[in-house]
Amino acid sequence: MTKREIAVLGGAHIDRRGRISDTTVPGASNPGTWFEEAGGGGFNAARNLARLGHRVRMISPRGGDSAGETVAAAAAAAGVIDCPFTFLDRKTPSYTAILEKDGNLVIALADMDLYALFSPRRLQQRATRELLAASDLVLADANLPQETLTALVEATAGTNRILAGIAVSPAKVVRYSQCLAGLDFLFMNEAEARALTGAEAAAAEEWPSLLRSAGLSGGVVTRGGKAAVAFDRETACLAVPPALPALADVTGAGDALASGFLAALLDGIGLAGCLRHGIAAAILTLHSPFAAAVEMSPGNLARVLTLVPEPQMLS
C-alpha cells in the first residue's frame, strides 16, 4: 500500500446512541443503555482511512465547547490531522440515535445547524485550497450545504484526484443533485438512492442504470445484510455480505464501507475488489461498539477479506 494524501470535508461531531435492552415498545419508556463518542460520516471515514495507513486531514466546523474537545481528541487518537474552523460562541453539532436490541436504527435526531456555516467561501481560503490541491482523494459528506458541495466539485474539476461523497441520509443526499456528474463515487443505502433518483428498484441490479440516468458515474448502494451493488462508468458488480452471527451496532458501517472501497481504489484495485474491501471494512465495524472501529488496520482488513465472496459482475 502506498500512503496517500486525503482531504475529508463534512461531519465531525458528537454521536449519542441509546440501545434498547429488550423488545422495542413505541410510545413508552424503554430500558436500555447510553453511549457517547465522536462521530459523523466524514469523520468516521477519515479515522478509518488514517488507520489504514493514509495521511488524512479533516476539515469541519466546530463549536468552542467540551464536545469539540472530544472530537479533537478522537482525531488525534486515530492519527487524523485535525483542521477545524471553530466558532467559540457555538455548540458542536450532535447526532442522537435510538437503536433496537439487535443494533438496527429506530429513530435519530440531528442537531447540526452549525454545518450551514461551512459556506463555499471557506473553500477559497488559501490553506484549504492548498490542502485540496495536494490531495489524491477528496471525500465530502452531505452534512455540507448544497452550494458548498457544488463549489467543491467545481474546485476539483479537471484534476486527477478522486472526488467521492457519502450520502449521510435520505434528507441530505439530495444536496448532491446539482453536482452528481462531478463525483467519481457516491456511497449510499437504498433509501438514499430512492431519495436521489425518485425511483424504486425492483432488484439491486437496477440501481446502476437508475443512478447513471440521474447523472452519477459511479457509486455503491448498500441494502443492509442483502446484496450491495457497485458501479462505475462502464461496469457494475453485486456482492452478498456474509451472514453475521452477532451484530454490535450498525452505526458507521456505511462510512466504513466507503473507507475500505476508497482505500482499495487508491491502491489501483478494480471495482469488484474495491467492493469486497468495502464490505470487509463494514464487517469490522459491525463487530465493534464504535462508529469507527479501533480494530481497523490493513492486517485486520486482509483477514476479514477472506470471508467476503467474490462479487458477481453484471452485464
Segments and roles (model prediction):
Residues 74-89:
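A glycine-rich helix N-cap at a beta->alpha junction
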Residues 47, 94-98, 107, 227-231:
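Short beta-strand scaffold segments in enzyme catalytic cores
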Residues 1-61, 66-77, 240, 247, ...:
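Glycine-rich phosphate/adenosyl-contacting loop at the front of the ribokinase-like
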Residues 1-7, 30, 204-315:
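Conserved phosphate-binding/catalytic region of the ribokinase-like
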Residues 5-6, 136-137, 185:
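Structural motif
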Residues 61, 87, 97-137, 142:
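Conserved phosphate-binding/catalytic loop of the ribokinase/pfkB sugar-kinase fold
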Residues 79, 118-123, 165-171:
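Short gly/ser/thr-rich secondary-structure transition/capping motifs
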Residues 150-153, 157-162, 167-238, 246:
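Conserved phosphate/ATP/ADP-binding segment of small-molecule kinases
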